[in-house]
């Protein structure tokens, strides 16, 4: 069989693709979408709450993520404060024992530490301080917050003058309707503190 040159065969109509995915349905990895942001204009707030979560997002999103840049306001500017979280209005200053937390902590001068808290009224996600103007940064993932067949698991990563990685369990199978953030010692949030909530769509 003779070999025929395409240059002489009259094949002039063709399509050129620059991607190996041509003709195939693209597969896009999941991406978190910004849902809400709260920026505090003044330092008179001690609790920041995101509400109506299940009714607004439960049918669309599988996981929630919070990204936080915050600091506890302090009269003397030299007070350290833990950042804590509670859900569905259960916990916080209202007391209770629905949360259990485990943290790995890296302190610059003291090395590594492990901390555990059980049967507390909040989940502990990290550390914020008013000392020297330091702000705390946090990433908080709430896994399957709208499931009603298992307890809710939360994982967190935070950084300030020390770094922490941890997780906690909220011992309740109810769908999450609200998430609240609060510093301990009844400290208010510093002006300019920012908390953004993202959602990862269900498959």
Description of each model-found segment:
Residues 2-203:
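Surface-exposed molecular-recognition determinants
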């Amino acid at each position: 069989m003779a070999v025929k040159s395409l240059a002489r065969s009259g094949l002039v109509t063709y399509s050129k693709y620059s991607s190996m995915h041509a003709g195939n349905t693209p597969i896009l990895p999941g991406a978190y979408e910004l849902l809400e942001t709260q920026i505090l204009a003044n330092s008179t707030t001690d609790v920041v709450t995101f509400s109506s979560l299940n009714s607004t997002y439960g049918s669309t999103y599988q996981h929630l993520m919070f990204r936080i840049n915050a600091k506890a306001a302090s009269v003397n500017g030299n007070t350290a404060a833990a950042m804590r979280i509670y859900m569905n209005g259960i916990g916080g200053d209202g007391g209770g024992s629905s949360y259990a937390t485990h943290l790995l902590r890296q302190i610059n001068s003291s090395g590594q530490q492990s901390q555990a808290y059980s049967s507390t009224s909040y989940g502990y996600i990290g550390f914020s301080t008013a000392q020297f103007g330091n702000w705390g940064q946090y990433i908080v993932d709430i896994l399957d917050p709208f499931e009603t067949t298992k307890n809710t698991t939360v994982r967190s990563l935070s950084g300030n003058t020390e770094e922490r990685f941890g997780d906690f369990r909220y011992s309740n199978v109810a769908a999450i309707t609200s998430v609240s953030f609060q510093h301990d010692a009844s400290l208010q949030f510093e002006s300019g503190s920012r908390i953004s909530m993202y959602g990862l769509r269900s498959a």
